[in-house]
Structures are given as C-alpha cells and as structure tokens.
C-alpha cells in the first residue's frame, strides 16, 4: 500500500508525524510500508525493553488469550497475582496496584500520598497534600501529572493547574528543604529525568533526600516509568543508590510494549479504602501475563549484568564520538543515555537519521541540543556499532 492509501486523516492531530506507516518489527529493527528497515534506538520511548515482538512475550500473550482475557478487576486472576508477587519479592515494596499507563500510575501515587497525608496530619493538625517535585521533571499528561511536572510551559497550557506541586532543583538538597511546610506530604522524582534531558539524580542526592524525608516524616516517591525495569542496569533505578522509597511507579518497560503500569508502596503507606482507586482494566490478565514474561526475562541470570555491560559500551562509543566532533559529552545510566551536542541540531539529526538510505535510524531529541538513546535492553554490540557508524556519518554532514 502507498502512504496515501492509509486513512491517517481520521486520526486526531496530536503531533507532527512523518509519512511512514510501520508494519513489522523484530528485535531492534522496524519495517515500514515500503519495506524500508530502521534501526530503532527509541523503542517507543523506552517501552519495548525486550525489543519488538519478543518471543517470550508473544508466547505469554497467545497462551493467556486462549484462557482468559478480562474477568473484571473486581476479582483476582492468576497473572495479576503472579506479577504482583514477582514485583514485591524483588523490591522493597509490599503492595501493588496495576494500571495501564505511567501517567495513571503517577496519578495513583499522588492520590495515595494525599490519602496518607490526611491520615497522618502535620504537627499543626493540617492535612498534608503538597508534593515537592522538580524543575524539568515529567510525570505524565493527565491534569494532575502535568501540574506535577516541571516541563517549561506546562503551567499555562491547561490552566488553572492542580495546586500542590512546588518545584525544587534536582541534585540540590537545600532547594528541597526550603520548600517543606506543614502541608508537605512527600517528594516525588525520577531517578533519571528522561524528558528533561537524561539528567540522573546523584547517589549522594538520593541518599540525602531519603534522610531528609525521614527526618520530616515525608513520603519519598520514585517515578520509574522510564528509568525502571532494567533500563539503568538494575531491576529498579532506586537500587543504584541503596535506598528504600515509600512509593514507586512503573510503566513503559513493565509491559514491554503492551499497556501496563504499576503503583507500588510499603504496607505502612497502603491507605486506600474501598472505592478510592480502581480502573476498568487494572490487573487485566492479558497484560499482566505479558508483564510476568518481561520481569522473568529481566531476572534471568546474567541479563541485568549484560545491560550494564552494553550500557558501558554505548557510553564509551558516545564519548569517543563526542571527542571526535568536539561535542559536550554524554550522560545517563545503563541503556538510558544522552549525547550532549553543544548546539541546537538535535531535531535536524533525528530527521536526517530517519531519512538515511537504504536503512534508516530512529533517534530522539528531548531537547534541541541533546540526542537520547533508549535501545532494547537486549541490543547487541554489533547493533550499537551500526548505530554509532550511522551517527558518525550524520555528524560529519550536520555537526
């Protein structure tokens, strides 16, 4: 089919899309309607943690579809319970609520923190509802999660905002402490700010934050929608800092490409009462069966060590490129990395990469002066080398 034969005009406009219709994908590769192949270093913004059409996920999806798709979240089902058990067994959390998107999980985290703050009032007897978040953070596109986000301009798009989200500066503990009041209930952050430009919170800052929140009896909430599920080389990114948060959210990678997210908390924080939280598809057995396959593959012997090795390899290759072209360096954790371009050519490089022939390359520029890399966690060093070679060609032409 030609592009003109696809009724794309029926889709609501939300962003500028190129005239490409993807029809197949396997591993690190996508194929479009013309048969052109693309090396994918975006993977749906870190969603496809095991690459496109992973065999284990396909098997889990097919097997579950033949047994049970949707009995209603008012009842238990087998994959729901199994995945909750896997997550609690391999984290510091005791309770799990499943949802469909990272924004929904983060919305749930905000509700849970506010519920806990009502039950645990301040010394002055006030309900605690404010959650300190951070400049340049990204927590979703619902009204509350947009208000929680520190993305420039989002405070006016759908004004008035949901109140209660003062903004601190990442890796500046004094900026957090200065915002604490009798109405503060918690602090919420991404261990690595993805949309903000792949900005990692330092281990020292995470430890300071945990100490500060404990001192003031506040909740520490980690948004691991992008950084979690093996992306940073550990199962969860908070584990890099040897701390234990009170609440964590997961999305993207937990489903490996299917709509699945999770809100996790400790027993002490689990405050919801009947009717406080729910959702038509939460804990859906079709999605949680795939989630079980994803987590089991991430926990397979040597897998996370391999992520660390390939992350170090990608880092070294990006640093070499940076030095060769006089760029501003690189940063990140594991296989969530950024190349600092030093000038606003990110969008130009993304477009040129996609249009390369005979094979295209999919990259992402969260900021005009940054390229972000989110390959499948099982990407090979050969595929990294191929990407670096293509990027080298682009930098020669556009750098």
UniProtKB/Swiss-Prot annotation:
The lineage of its organism: Bacteria, Pseudomonadati, Pseudomonadota, Betaproteobacteria, Burkholderiales. Belongs to the class-III pyridoxal-phosphate-dependent aminotransferase family. ArgD subfamily. This is Acetylornithine aminotransferase. The modification N6-(pyridoxal phosphate)lysine is found at residue 252. GO terms for cellular component: cytoplasm. Homodimer. InterPro entries: AcOrn/SuccOrn_fam (IPR004636), Aminotrans_3 (IPR005814), Aminotrans_3_PPA_site (IPR049704), Class-III_PLP-dep_AT (IPR050103), PyrdxlP-dep_Trfase (IPR015424), PyrdxlP-dep_Trfase_major (IPR015421), PyrdxlP-dep_Trfase_small (IPR015422). It comes from Ralstonia nicotianae (strain ATCC BAA-1114 / GMI1000) (Ralstonia solanacearum). Keywords: Amino-acid biosynthesis, Aminotransferase, Arginine biosynthesis, Cytoplasm, Pyridoxal phosphate, Transferase. GO terms for biological process: L-arginine biosynthetic process. Pyridoxal 5'-phosphate binds at residues 102-103, 138, 223-226, 280. The gene is argD.
């Amino acid at each position: 089919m030609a592009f003109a034969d696809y009724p794309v005009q029926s889709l609501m406009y939300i962003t500028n899309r190129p005239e490409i219709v993807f029809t197949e994908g396997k591993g690190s590769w996508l194929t479009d309607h013309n048969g052109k192949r693309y090396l994918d270093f975006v993977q749906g913004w870190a969603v496809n943690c095991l690459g496109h059409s992973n065999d284990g996920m396909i098997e889990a999806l097919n097997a579950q579809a033949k047994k049970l798709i949707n009995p209603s979240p008012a009842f238990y089902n087998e994959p729901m319970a199994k995945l909750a058990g896997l997550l609690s067994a391999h984290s510091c959390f005791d309770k799990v609520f499943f949802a469909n998107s990272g924004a929904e999980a983060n919305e749930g985290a905000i509700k849970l923190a506010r519920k806990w703050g009502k039950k645990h009032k301040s010394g002055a007897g006030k309900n605690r509802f404010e959650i300190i978040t951070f400049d340049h953070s990204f927590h979703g596109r619902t009204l509350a999660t947009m208000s929680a986000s520190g993305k420039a301009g989002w405070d006016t798009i759908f004004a008035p905002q949901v109140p209660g989200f003062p903004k601190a500066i990442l890796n500046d503990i004094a900026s957090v402490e200065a915002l604490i009041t009798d109405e503060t209930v918690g602090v919420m952050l991404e261990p690595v700010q993805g949309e903000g430009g792949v900005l990692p919170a330092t281990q020292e800052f995470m430890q300071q934050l945990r100490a500060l929140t404990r001192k003031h009896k506040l909740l520490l909430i980690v948004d691991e929608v992008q950084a979690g599920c093996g992306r940073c080389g550990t199962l969860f990114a908070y584990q890099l800092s040897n701390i234990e948060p009170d609440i964590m959210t997961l999305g993207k990678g937990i489903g490996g490409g299917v709509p699945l997210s999770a809100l996790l908390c400790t027993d002490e924080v689990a405050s919801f009462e009947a009717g406080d939280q729910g959702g038509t598809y939460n804990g859906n057995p079709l999605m949680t069966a795939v989630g079980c396959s994803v987590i089991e593959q991430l926990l397979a012997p040597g897998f996370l060590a391999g992520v660390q090795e390939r992350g170090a390899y990608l880092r070294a290759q990006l640093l070499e490129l940076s030095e060769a072209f006089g760029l501003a360096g690189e940063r990140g954790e594991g296989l969530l990395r950024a190349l600092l371009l030093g000038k606003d050519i990110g969008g130009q490089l993304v477009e040129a990469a996609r249009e390369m022939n005979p094979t295209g390359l999919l990259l992402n520029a969260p900021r005009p002066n940054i390229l972000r890399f989110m390959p499948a966690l099982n990407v090979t060093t050969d595929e990294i080398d191929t990407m670096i070679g293509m990027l080298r060609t682009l930098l020669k032409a556009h750098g």
